[in-house]
């Protein structure tokens, strides 16, 4: 990827883009007009500034393309930076510290406090400070890389034109060689339940509650549900998650890991009702909410009363008023934009990436697609191995995985072997008094090649990147087992699990 950057930056400086046979059609550099003009000419126009959009815009500019990024919100960064990944991680981290201090954890380490008090306003302030710094950072990167930022609601008004409607009703027209749709996703509504972001909230409202609820019900025990539910459970709420499926952690999680994960969360005080569906919710005169539930297969109805109801049943692609219908670009049955392997829609110069196309709705997946997509516009190779895209649940302990689960391997009829290592036998986890969880490695029986890695425990979100690298390069379990890992570190558990998978036995367990 770096070599492509050097080649195209060099060509851009020498004005040779029009000689690239696979590049943008008619890509001679065109001077960009200022904001005061009615029209902007560009080579690439990105609609959306979330992880996929802003990264794609910067990469396009670095490749020498005249780039515009249209964003409907006042701040850059999309859902992830403003009301998703970033603020939730701030609350997850700080609520974990509070939980340690308020419970017996600190005392067991010899740290004694006479009084531990939660200042929720201060916690929210720290979250907002982090968000502001990062969104401002994107604005700085745009300026540094000469990406033109247009604040307005972007609509494709022609195969070579985007019109941004601003808050004041004014419009900015961009004539562009290529268009990249990176508009992300929005919260999936629950039929019959109206979200007011006050007491019936989506993930957005759950990040900004004014006080800790006495009782909270979470609809959905997937990634977002367990993350946000655990935040408020740690801060003192009585939290119950109602999940239609028979496990926690969402789609893709290994079932053995999921069961252990659920057990640990329950030990912390998080409650679950699995194989259960929500049939409705009613606000009472005292402000509380009655949530009606019953077994997923049907059965006796039950009512749970709560102060706050959090709806976390997933997200759906955001393609509203993009102008796709007028262009003849149809959506698939799940509302996604169909694209080919180069991320092109049925109109070759209109591309789409991230949550609006097929695949997991992950920020890092969108970032990778954004980079690869614009490199493809410039004539570069386009390839992503989606089997090597990791997933992380940022609770404590964390859960992370990449590659195949045991259930997937069984379904596909692939013969495999398993290597496991518990954090209870890891010296660093022991010294940290943080020993819940394990590392589980799945290797191909005939070749020893790593097929999947599943981690439940401290630092899982960092450790999984070593596993992703191993899968990307087709490493064997023995390859990893023979790599010297620093001692004492948590990642030694990853090596030990690969020892167990390759040789049938780990050293320290």
From Swiss-Prot:
Its EC number is 1.8.1.4. It is found in: Mitochondrion matrix; Nucleus; Cell projection, Cilium, Flagellum; Cytoplasmic vesicle, Secretory vesicle, Acrosome. The record marks 448, 473 as: Important for interaction with PDHX and activity of pyruvate dehydrogenase complex. The modification N6-acetyllysine is found at residues 66, 104, 122, 132, 143, 346, 410, 417, 420, 505. Keywords: Acetylation, Cell projection, Cilium, Cytoplasmic vesicle, Disulfide bond, FAD, Flagellum, Flavoprotein, Mitochondrion, NAD, Nucleus, Oxidoreductase, Phosphoprotein, Redox-active center, Transit peptide. Pfam families: Pyr_redox_2 (PF07992), Pyr_redox_dim (PF02852). Tyrosine phosphorylated. One of its GO terms (cellular component) is motile cilium. It catalyses: N(6)-[(R)-dihydrolipoyl]-L-lysyl-[protein] + NAD(+) = N(6)-[(R)-lipoyl]-L-lysyl-[protein] + NADH + H(+). Binds 1 FAD per subunit. GO terms for molecular function: dihydrolipoyl dehydrogenase (NADH) activity; flavin adenine dinucleotide binding. The active site is at residue 487. NAD(+) binds at residues 220-227, 243, 278, 314. Its cofactor is FAD. Disulfide bonds join 80-85. The keyword Acetylation applies. The modification N6-succinyllysine is found at residues 66, 104, 122, 132, 143, 159, 166, 273, 277, 410, 430, 505. The keyword Ion transport does not apply. InterPro entries: Class-I_Pyr_Nuc-Dis_Oxidored (IPR050151), FAD/NAD-bd_sf (IPR036188), FAD/NAD-binding_dom (IPR023753), FAD/NAD-linked_Rdtase_dimer_sf (IPR016156), Lipoamide_DH (IPR006258), Pyr_nuc-diS_OxRdtase (IPR001100), Pyr_nucl-diS_OxRdtase_dimer (IPR004099), Pyr_OxRdtase_I_AS (IPR012999). It comes from the Eukaryota. Lipoamide dehydrogenase is a component of the glycine cleavage system as well as an E3 component of three alpha-ketoacid dehydrogenase complexes (pyruvate-, alpha-ketoglutarate-, and branched-chain amino acid-dehydrogenase complex). The 2-oxoglutarate dehydrogenase complex is mainly active in the mitochondrion. A fraction of the 2-oxoglutarate dehydrogenase complex also localizes in the nucleus and is required for lysine succinylation of histones: associates with KAT2A on chromatin and provides succinyl-CoA to histone succinyltransferase KAT2A. Homodimer. Part of the multimeric pyruvate dehydrogenase complex that contains multiple copies of pyruvate dehydrogenase (subunits PDHA (PDHA1 or PDHA2) and PDHB, E1), dihydrolipoamide acetyltransferase (DLAT, E2) and lipoamide dehydrogenase (DLD, E3). These subunits are bound to an inner core composed of about 48 DLAT and 12 PDHX molecules (by non covalent bonds). The 2-oxoglutarate dehydrogenase complex is composed of OGDH (2-oxoglutarate dehydrogenase; E1), DLST (dihydrolipoamide succinyltransferase; E2), DLD (dihydrolipoamide dehydrogenase; E3) and the assembly factor KGD4. The active site is a redox-active disulfide bond. This is Dihydrolipoyl dehydrogenase, mitochondrial. It comes from Macaca fascicularis (Crab-eating macaque).
């Amino acid at each position: 990827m770096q070599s492509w950057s050097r080649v195209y930056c060099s060509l851009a400086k020498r004005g040779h883009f029009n000689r690239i046979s696979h590049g943008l059609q008619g890509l001679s550099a065109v001077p960009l007009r200022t904001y005061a003009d009615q029209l902007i000419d560009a080579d690439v126009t990105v609609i959306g500034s979330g992880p996929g959009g802003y990264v794609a815009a910067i990469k396009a500019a670095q490749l020498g393309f005249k780039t515009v990024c249209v964003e409907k919100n006042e701040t850059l960064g999309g859902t992830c930076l403003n009301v998703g990944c970033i603020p939730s991680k701030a609350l997850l981290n700080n609520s974990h510290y509070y939980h340690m201090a308020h419970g017996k954890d600190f005392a067991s380490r010899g740290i004694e406090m006479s009084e531990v008090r939660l200042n929720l306003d201060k916690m929210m302030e720290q979250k907002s400070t982090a968000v502001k710094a990062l969104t401002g950072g994107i604005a700085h990167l745009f300026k540094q890389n000469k990406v033109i930022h247009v604040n307005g609601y972007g609509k494709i008004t022609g195969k070579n034109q985007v019109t941004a409607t601003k808050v004041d009703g004014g419009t900015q027209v961009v004539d562009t060689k290529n268009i990249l749709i990176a508009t992300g996703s929005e919260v999936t509504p629950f039929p019959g339940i109206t979200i007011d972001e006050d007491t019936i909230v989506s993930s957005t409202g759950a990040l900004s509650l004014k006080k800790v609820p006495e009782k909270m019900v979470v609809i959905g025990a997937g990634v977002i549900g367990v993350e946000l539910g655990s935040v408020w459970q740690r801060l003192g709420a009585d939290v119950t998650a109602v999940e239609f499926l028979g496990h926690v952690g969402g789609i893709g999680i290994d079932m053995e890991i999921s069961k252990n994960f659920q057990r640990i969360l329950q030990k912390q005080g998080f409650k679950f009702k699995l194989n259960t569906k929500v049939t409705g919710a009613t606000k009472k005169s005292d402000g509380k909410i009655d949530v009606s539930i019953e077994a997923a297969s049907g059965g006796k109805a039950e009512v749970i009363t709560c102060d706050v109801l959090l709806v976390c049943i997933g997200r759906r692609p955001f393609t509203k008023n993009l102008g796709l219908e007028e262009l003849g670009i149809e959506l698939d049955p799940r509302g996604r934009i169909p694209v080919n392997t180069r991320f092109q829609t049925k109109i070759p110069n209109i591309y789409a990436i991230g949550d609006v196309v097929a695949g997991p709705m992950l920020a890092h997946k969108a970032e990778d697609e954004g980079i690869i997509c614009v490199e493809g516009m410039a004539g570069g190779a386009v390839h992503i191995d989606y089997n090597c895209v990791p997933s992380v649940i940022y609770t404590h302990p964390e859960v992370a995985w990449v590659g195949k689960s045991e259930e997937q391997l069984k379904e596909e009829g692939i013969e495999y072997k398993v290597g496991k290592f518990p954090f209870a036998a890891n010296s660093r986890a022991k010294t940290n008094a943080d020993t819940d969880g394990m590392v589980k490695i799945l290797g191909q029986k005939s070749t020893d090649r790593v097929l999947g890695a599943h981690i439940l425990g401290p630092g899982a979100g960092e450790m999984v990147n070593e596993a992703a690298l191993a899968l990307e390069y087709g490493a064997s379990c023995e390859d990893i087992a023979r790599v010297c890992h620093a001692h004492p570190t948590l990642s030694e558990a990853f090596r030990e699990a690969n020892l167990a998978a390759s040789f049938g036995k780990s050293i320290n367990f």
